[in-house]
Amino acid sequence: MNTAAPSRKKLLSLVLTLVFMLTCLPAALAVDLNVDAGFYFKQSRGGTCTLASAAMMLRRRAYFDGLTDWSTVTENSVRSTAWSNGLSHSFTYKEMQVGYATLPSGLQSKTAVLISLLEQHPEGIVFYDRTQPHAVLLTDYTNGIFYCSDPAGNIGYG
């Protein structure tokens, strides 16, 4: 009687199960950056929506990069390197570089550029509207909808 075959089948089954579990593990442990895991907050005072949005973006980038102190990225911690009577157009905070760009004219062109930027920068984009002087953190584009976090104190969700 051959008892080796059933043992090999059990061992192979166990190994395949472990391999399957290991391939699923990263997805199971991943945090969706669009779910609030402590990334988002409201601005500390009026007129700092750009600073608060930038701090949330940097907080998400720090988390994404695996920095354990990502939750210490706050409006106040970013202020000294990013703020001078308004958000600086370019600055570096904890080795994370932030730049400035202007969107092209035309809705389709703007949409295409924003989608491309979000693909390159999953931490998000600080989006400032000069006509409404206000900034939000643009975080995602899914199924034709842009998602954002609005730091304004009078906005409950968004």
Give residue ranges: language-model regions.
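Conserved active-site-adjacent core of cysteine acyl-enzyme catalytic domains
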Residues: V31-Y40, S53-G158
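Short intrinsically disordered, low-complexity segments
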Residues: S7-K9, M21, D32
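Bacterial N-terminal signal peptides that target proteins for export
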Residues: N2-V15
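Glutamine-centric residue-chemistry signal
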Residues: K42-S44
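Active-site-proximal loop/helix segment associated with metal-binding centers of metalloenzymes
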Residues: C49
